[in-house]
Amino acid sequence: MKCQRIEDDFTLKFYVFLLINTCSSIPFLFITTRGMASMHSLAILLLGVVMLTTPVLAEYYKPPTYEPPIEKPPIYEPPPTEEPPPVYKPPIIHPPPNYKPPAHTPPIYHPPHEKPPPVYEPPYEKPPHEEPPREYQPPRENPSPEYEPPHHGKPPYENPPPEYKPPYEKPPPEYQPPHHEKPPPEYQPPHEKPPPEYTPPYEKPPPEYQPPHEKPPHESSPPEYQPPHEKPPHEHPPPEYQPPHEKPPHEHPPPEYQPPHEKPPHVHPPPEYQPPHEHPPPEYQPPHEKPPHVHPPPEYQPPYLKPPHEKSPYEPPPQEYQPPHEKPPQMKPPSEYQPPHEKPPHEHPPPEYQPPHVHPPPEHQPPHENPPHENPPPEYQPPHEKPPHYEHPPPENQPPHVHPPPEYKPPHEKPPHEHPPPEYQPPQENPPPEYKPPHEKPPHENTPPTHHPPHEKPPQEISLPEYQPPPPSTKYQPPHEKSPHENPPPEFAPPHKKLPPNYNPPRHEKPMPKYQPPHEKLPPVYKSPYVKTPPPQAYHPPPPIYHHPPFHPPPHVKPPVYETPLAKVPQMKKPTRYNTRPFGHYPPYKKNQ
């Protein structure tokens, strides 16, 4: 609607402008045409102006038609580029400098210093931690399995009778005379401490070879019989001199060798001894000596003189006389008479009698019976035995492993899971109570203090009980069943008699100094007795010596890629919108114009 109105206004203005120009040109035309005989041309001109302006004036009374507004899309105007794009300037690449040899005389060539070849040192093998070399254990060859019939019944497990140990009987107390009969004290010489004996440092014994433990199926060894623990009487013996404790390094008993659990079906054969792969010492390669770049004087080459080409005069061979070739006359033999070929009449022989083809009766084919599908017994494949990984194999070579021929193994029948009968535990026998006599306070006597050596905690030693199998000849002793109210009568203990006091030297006597053993440096603790040998180092020749300075090409400079500056994305202006025209009102209300 807006565009249409603008076009109508433009047309109206054009016609008004044409009318004004026409009216202004009337006097000029009148002047130019006054010499005419008539005003006929002026009337025609005025009539044309009226006819041109009449339609425009007539459209004023035409009611306008409403046309909905047309939203004209905004015209995109690119943002003004204030700064012109930068002009690409290629980088200045300087040409490489031409090598100019030095003006002075070339230096005297000194051959390069030849470094003596490195002395091959065998790989250092750290000896094990004071362990003798392991003895070669020959491979354990399993005997050929014998056929065992299927186990139908398991006999009851009979524990061997435990060895009977009589209960500990406390010896009767010795008679102590009464306290009032005190014998005269005997003279006790001064106690001289003997010098402590030197205890050598603890040396760990080499571990003994323990054969691989093969656990039988569901059969546990009978537990060791543990006698009842009887606490000895609480008697303090006189203190003995305890030298200062020197804690050895890790004084734990050597752990028992526990080989890896070998599964019965997977028994790996002993591997063949593979000697350690020792790289041969690298051969000495002398350094490559480039001779000095000195051109030797050219040898004198005499000018090549082409020998004179002595061409002997060509003497053609004498030609022999060839008589003229006379072709003999071609004599054709007289042609023989050929009688005319007469084709015999086409006579077919009489056909032979062919008896009718009689098919013989079909032979009886018995029904095809597939033989029973009998799989042949599978061949015994011995289990794949992976050789154990020895970091340091035994020093001696092993004999070649000979696989025994496989024998038939019957199907394994698992015996019934029977728990062994519980082992008999004898009742705990408490020792009889000790009678403690009444405490009699001795007379108050000031005795000099006794010197007690410093208490040093003994090392904690872990001892493992050794398995002692019960003797086969012991007879089973039934447990002693204690009858009710069978307490033994209390033993009579006489009154406590004070022992004569020990002689204590007077205070002015200085005690003997303690023996301090020399400080021994503990041996270093090795993490592993085996040390990986370092690989031999390869010989690297020295770098070559250049007699001319090397030519290094200039670095490759990649020209920058010109990219136009990223123009800002134009923000689309919000199109002009009009309010909803109220019904019955004209013209519409313009909002954003």
Curated annotation (Swiss-Prot):
Instruction: Please list the residue ranges that the record marks as compositionally biased, kind Pro residues.
Output: 71-110, 196-210, 294-306, 422-435, 532-558
Ranges annotated as spanning the membrane: none
The alphabetized list of GO BP terms reads: nodulation
- What's in the keyword line of the UniProt record? Nodulation, Signal
Q: Please give the superkingdom of this protein's source.
A: Eukaryota
* Compositionally biased region (Basic and acidic residues): 123-138, 166-195, 227-265, 275-292, 339-350, 360-372, 382-394, 404-421, 506-522
- Report the induction information: Accumulates in response to Sinorhizobium meliloti inoculation leading to nodulation.
| Paired cysteines (S-S) | none
Q: Where is this region: Disordered?
A: 71-593
Q: Which family does it belong to?
A: Belongs to the nodulin 75 family.
Role played: Involved in early stages of root nodule development.
Report what the protein is called. Early nodule-specific protein 2
- High-level lineage: Eukaryota, Viridiplantae, Streptophyta, Embryophyta, Tracheophyta
Q: Which gene encodes it?
A: ENOD2
